[in-house]
Amino acid sequence: MIKWNNLNTLSSFENLSKVERVKLTEVMSGENGADRVKKYTIPMAAGLAYNYAAKQVDDDVLEALTKLAEEAQLAEKFEALYNGEVINTGEKRLVLHHMTRGQLGEAVEADGVDKRTFYTEQQKKIADFANKVHAGEITNAAGEKFTTVVQIGIGGSDLGPRAMYLALENWAKKNNTFKMEAKFISNVDPDDAAAVLNSIDVAHSIFVLVSKSGTTLETLTNESFVKDALKNAGLDASKHMIAVTSETSPLAKSDDYLAAFFMDDYIGGRFSSTSAVGGAVLSLAFGPEVFAQFLQGAAEEDKLAMNKNVLENPEMLDALIGVYERNVLGYPSTAVLPYSQALSRFPAHLQQLDMESNGKSVNRFGEAVNYPTGPVIFGEPGTNGQHSFYQLLHQGTDIVPLQFVGFKNSQIGTDVVIQDSTSQQKLCANVAAQIVAFACGKADENKNKNFEGGRPSSIIIGEELTPEALGALLAHFENKIMFQGFVWNVNSFDQEGVQLGKVLAKRVLAHETDGALKVFSDLLNI
């Protein structure tokens, strides 16, 4: 029987708190460090590997984390989730994003349909539509091919799909699978939509409107912006727009769209990149086969997350180490540092994924928790970040755990040899150097040049950023965050924190304000 208990009521957590702290500067130096790098690694899907040698753990800490995983019933809770139990208690919903890429357990029926069948049917509809667009069977009014796809959405309808598109754009061009350029309109700031529309030929563009409810204010505002642009160009908007929405939304059966593809209430926006939300734009941009490869990588990583052996489950171990850093070592934030320019927006996606999921101060039963939960997430690609905020990471007063991602090979393959090494070798040399520099530091009599070390990090290493590798990487972090939510006993699948601002904004626009809200409204000439 599954029990949902607060972290600080678990005896295994109390025992974890008593385990002797690991001194990174000692264990990562010399041959000790070399042995750790070889020992502390777990294979992932798509040729990736999770290496945690530079984390503040040893065999004693790992044993205590294993006991915590067992007492918190992490494997059992994941099993309950993928078998269709109501895990999103706040909204009384199932949590089924894993089912968009595979069925891990029993068949799940909801709304009178088999959900795996529902998701695969939508994928097939999207694939058929994308193939017809690419073949010139679906065209603009002049019979000309569409060359650009523009996604209109916000939050999870933008951050994830945008990050995935940018991650695979160069790979697709190199591997001759690049079909259409993709653009994204998300912010209600009119300059966002205007800038995108000014940069494209609207006559050869197809727009993907993404809104589960069909009532999202920012998205519908931007839809109107786009419709005006199409009308001003003498074009019929209904011949240029498709919708990704729920079957019950007002968009579902509207004549305003060429086609509609469906999602449901069991996949939260931030977990929707492998659903129709990501599927439509990525299939149009790169072809359905590439999207299928992306799903395959995620599916294989999901299977690894089922392993009850913590030391063979990269997602569960990553999650537990993060809990240890947050709740025992007291570190308030985590930096995500991909050494790949293609992953330039991946930290922003993980920021939403993590902070919207686990940025909670009450447990699953609505009771206040008296321990820290989700950390602040930020990041930037390397080596750019080294010339930005790494100063604080190395010598600041706060210790910030680091999550590196690196690949042995570039996507495009074009490179140059300068001073006996290629650019890719320089990139990889920097990430290796940073891991050791953060862990070991460097003593100096000049305190301004002294590096304390003891800054923990992990790295996910792969051969190349491919669709399968990207899918595995995404699933790793989705599952890590899920496991952490289980440990903290919070509901990782709702987001009530985004609601209050929306309510007040509507009051401002209706001129129903008083007090400070009215004064701020007046200052902004609303």
Give each language-model segment a name.
Residues 1-73, 312, 316-325, 343-346, ...:
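Flexible, glycine-rich loop/tail regions that form catalytic "lids" or insertion modules at the edges
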Residues 449, 464-517:
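C-terminal structured subdomain/cap of oxidoreductase catalytic cores
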Residues 128-136, 142-308, 507-510:
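Glycine-rich phosphate-binding loops that contact phosphosugars or nucleotide phosphates
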Residues 164-169, 198-202, 224-226, 350-358, ...:
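Short, solvent-exposed amphipathic alpha-helical segments in soluble enzyme
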Residues 147-155, 207-213, 333-340, 377, ...:
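Short glycine-rich or small-residue beta-strand-to-loop segments that form or flank ligand, phosphate
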Residues 229-414, 453, 500-526:
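Active-site phosphate/pyrophosphate-binding segments
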Residues 413-449:
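Acidic, Ser/Thr-rich peripheral helices and adjacent loops at domain boundaries
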Residues 4-142, 419-428, 439-440, 462, ...:
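Extended, charge-enriched "interface" segments that sit outside catalytic cores
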